[in-house]
Amino acid sequence: MQQLNPSEISEIIKGRIDNLDVSSQARNEGTVVSVSDGIVRIHGLADVMYGEMIEFPGGVYGMALNLEQDSVGAVILGAYDTLAEGMSAKCTGRILEVPVGKELLGRVVDALGNPIDGKGPLGNTQTDAVEKVAPGVIWRKSVDQPVQTGYKSVDAMIPVGRGQRELIIGDRQIGKTAMAIDAIINQKNSGIFCVYVAVGQKRSTVANIVRKLEETGALANTIVVVASASESAALQFLAPYAGCTMGEFFRDRGEDALIVYDDLSKQAVAYRQISLLLRRPPGREAYPGDVFYLHSRLLERASRVSEEYVEKFTNGAVTGKTGSLTALPIIETQAGDVSAFVPTNVISITDGQIFLESAMFNSGIRPAVNAGVSVSRVGGAAQTKIIKKLSGGIRTALAQYRELAAFAQFASDLDEATRKQLEHGQRVTELMKQKQYAPMSIADMALSLYAAERGFLIDVEVSKIGSFEQALIAFFNRDHAELMAKINVKGDFNDEIDAGLKAGIEKFKATQTW
């Protein structure tokens, strides 16, 4: 019997392999290896893109987020109870898109743009990619037009401009959403379209917000995007991007839009959940390493774009108009800790923050804006002229009052100047209080600020400041309607308006009707 030589066998095998004619072909169909917690691992998808839609049997879709050497990790968008190991998975060659357009105004949709308000299907909408690159520096324009929130404390001290990103930050149940909703209500007649993105909120809370927007007539101007607390982490992670794409539709066509993200803390938690399930390495507070990029790529899309950008985007259909998308992201802190990971990230990305304080809220100062810590980095250039002129001393008065009030608790005998500063500060603090769902016009705000700035409140009791302000505004809107209309339209401050306001307030104070 002839003995086989191992080296000969290996040579024969090598020769056979070399002569084998196999054309390498990329496969765009794979097999589901595992399904758990909304995460699917797929083997055999050779040419899948990051963020690509993957189709499963039964019309279920997923999104590829982990591209590994031997498998692909994808999140399922929606229910995944029909999926099982061994099922096929196909590449679609498309990234996720959502409906955009004016047909969405007045509607409530989910994170994928499907209507959930029972008003029937959407009209003829076009679709656009959820993930888009923000406009470059060359295409941007500086912020120089205001977004009136209707809050005295914000518009006077922390003004917001069109194309700005202004963070609203504070503990839970402190009025963050109330402030954002009032800002949306105030845009009813301003020509600014609004998008409200609810992430991880209770459905009952969102239903109340939608009802309030409908009652005030602001819903017709607003798109509501909802990824409630009962929905998957994938949809909560995607909702802000979907809302941003809907807002960009207006910006890119030379319109102005305002978007509220309520809130990005819950989006970060949803993204952390997805990342940990995908077995990505955790970092600080168990968040993944790219949680900064999660928010920066979203908030950089809020911008003011130039006439050239709009003209190029619309192929010359719209000329001579700038577009803007203003963002009001909301972040929830734990016990006022603004130095936590996500709050510090978003503070560094945005153009300023409105800090709401629990102690002020509990002492009855609502909105509970802490003027000392709050700042608007670019809004000053966009502030209405009359508000800018009259609000100069307001922030100083409040800062001095807070400092002196703490000092005055220990000192028994105060000098005249200190006592006057304290009294003025008390009245300004009282004047900054405002009821929910009652945004003010520019003229009403200017009138209140003028009364405080020119010392007309000094002889009014602190407890009666609120009723004095209401009666004063009612008096001016009745007897000086022409002056108020002029302020609302032009927003200028000159000697004529100064004299008109002064004479009107003196006449009102003589009546003693508050």
Swiss-Prot record:
Statement: the UniProt record of this protein carries the keyword Ion transport: yes
Keyword flag Transport: yes
Functional note: Produces ATP from ADP in the presence of a proton gradient across the membrane. The alpha chain is a regulatory subunit.
Catalytic reaction annotation: ATP + H2O + 4 H(+)(in) = ADP + phosphate + 5 H(+)(out)
Compartment list: Cell inner membrane
EC id: 7.1.2.2
Site (Required for activity): 374
Example GO molecular function: ATP binding
Listed name of the protein: ATP synthase subunit alpha
One GO CC annotation: plasma membrane
Source species of the chain: Pseudomonas putida (strain ATCC 700007 / DSM 6899 / JCM 31910 / BCRC 17059 / LMG 24140 / F1)
SUPFAM superfamilies xref list: C-terminal domain of alpha and beta subunits of F1 ATP synthase, N-terminal domain of alpha and beta subunits of F1 ATP synthase, P-loop containing nucleoside triphosphate hydrolases
Assigned protein family: Belongs to the ATPase alpha/beta chains family.
Membrane topology: Peripheral membrane protein
Pfam families: ATP-synt_ab, ATP-synt_ab_C, ATP-synt_ab_N
NCBIfam families: atpA, PRK13343.1
CDD domains documented for this protein: ATP-synt_F1_alpha_C (cd18113), ATP-synt_F1_alpha_N (cd18116), F1-ATPase_alpha_CD (cd01132)
